[in-house]
Amino acid sequence: MQFGRLVLGVMLAGAIAGGWTAMGADSVKTHKKGHAAAAVTDNDPNLWLSDIHGAKAVAWAKERTDKTLATLKADPNYQRDYDSILKILNANDRIAFGNLDHGDVFNFWQDAQHVRGLWRKATIAEYAKADPKWDVLLDVDALDKAEGKPWVFQGADCAPGFKRCLVKLSPGGSDAAVVREFDPNTKTFLKDGFTLPVAKSDTTYLDADTILFGTDFGPGTMTKSSYPRIVKIWHRGQPITAAKTVYEAKPDDISARASVFRGPYGTIALISRGLTFFTSEYYYVMPDGTTMKLPIPVGADIKGVTQGNLLFTLRNAWTPEGGKEIPQGSLV
C-alpha cells in the first residue's frame, strides 16, 4: 500500500508541479462507465434494430410489448400491483437522494407532475431540513414543451466555480444524447457554448474554458462496443475541428473516457482505456497534452484523490514492482 501511494504520489505531484493550475476546492468529478454493448458488424442480420425510431424496429418492439403486456395483465393482481408501485414511485414523501458537488446537494426529481423531471440543488443546511427549499436549475418538462422534443435528462458535469455545465439530453431516452452548455446562474443554454450533436459522447471540464471529450467523429472513431475511442481537448472559441487528439484506444477496446479531479493539490486529468467491462488502463494527461501510463493494475477501480494521491480498490491481489502482495479488495 505504501509503495503504491509513493509511486503515484510522486508521479502526480511532479506532473502537477509542471503545469496544471490549481482550481480551488471544487469537488471531485468522475464519470460512470457505460455498459458494454454487443459488437455490431455490417453483416449483423439484426442491424436494423439499431434504428430505434425506424418503422420496422418500432413495429417489432410494439408487437413484443403487446404480447408481454397481455401476459402480465392476465395475472389478477396486475392492476393492484401496478397502481401500488406507481404510487410509491410518485410519492412526494420519498427520500430525495442527492450528490454533493460544488458545495451543494444536487438531485434529479420526477413525480406525477414532473414526468420528465427537475434538475435542482439545495445548500447542505437546507437539505438537512425536513422540507428543503430547492433551487430548480432545469425543468425538463418545460424544456420539452418549449422545444417540442421528448428530452430525457442524462446528467450534467459542471465547471470549476459552477459557472457553466455540460448537460446531456437524450431525444426519447436513447443511449445517444446531445451535449449543450448551460449557465446554472441564468438557467439558460448558451448559444455559443460547447455543443455536440446526438451521439454516445463523454465530456468533462478540464477548466472553465476547456473540455476533454469523446464522441462519434465519423467512421472508425467508435469502438466495436459503440463507445468513443478517441479523447480530444477542445478550447472555448475553437471550432470542433480544431480539437486536438489526446488519446486513442483500439477498436476492440470498450471505450476511452476522461475524468478530472480537483482540489487544493491542483487538477488531475485521467483517461481510462476500457479493456473489458471490469478492467482498464489509466493514463495521466500531462500539461502539454501528452499522456503517461500509470503503474496500477488493470483491475483497479479508482475512487478519488486525497492530497494529490490516487485512491483505488483492487479487484484482484496485486504485487507492485519491488513490493509485497496487496490483498484483493484493499484500498490503495
Segment roles from a protein language model:
Residues 8-14, 19-332:
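Beta-propeller folds
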Residues 1-8:
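Bacterial N-terminal signal peptides that target proteins for export
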